[in-house]
Amino acid sequence: KVDQALRKSSPGLYVDLSAIAKGFGVDKVGELLESEGFNHYLVDIGGDMKAVGSNPDGQGWRIGIERPDAEGREIEKLIEVKNFGVATSGDYRNYFERDGQRYSHTINSVTGRPITHRLASVTVVAPTATEADGMATAIMALGPEQGLKLAKEQGLGVFFLVREGEGFSESMSPGF
């Protein structure tokens, strides 16, 4: 018999599956709502969302994209969404700094090191919250240039906020 348990030797080490778990949870709650006859809803788990149908005013659901600032919670852009999942990934909440360099919690799978590029935040609009969540993390790991290439190849709606000096520049994929 093979023991399938995951063990860790360092007490301070942990695995954080929020890069995919929140979007998956959003979709599961949406499935439950739909099975109960709801066809107009907005589900939000930790900023990952699924917007279906219309809001109470008969419009699409308005969602604010935060400015990637560790100190505040300002809205950078408002979008209106109907029948899509939305997820944002960024380096402005979970990071550390050493010798003036910011190190993100997102790891580059090629180097095994934290990402260090200028992409501060990426928001993905996709058919499901699971897809939006996973692609936001993947694009965040890739950086702005490769992330835009992937967004175009996959036909995704993606909004980028890239660090430029003391501020940010905005760009988006054609599908956004």
What would you call each of these model-derived segments?
Residues K1-F176:
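Mature catalytic core of soluble alpha/beta enzymes
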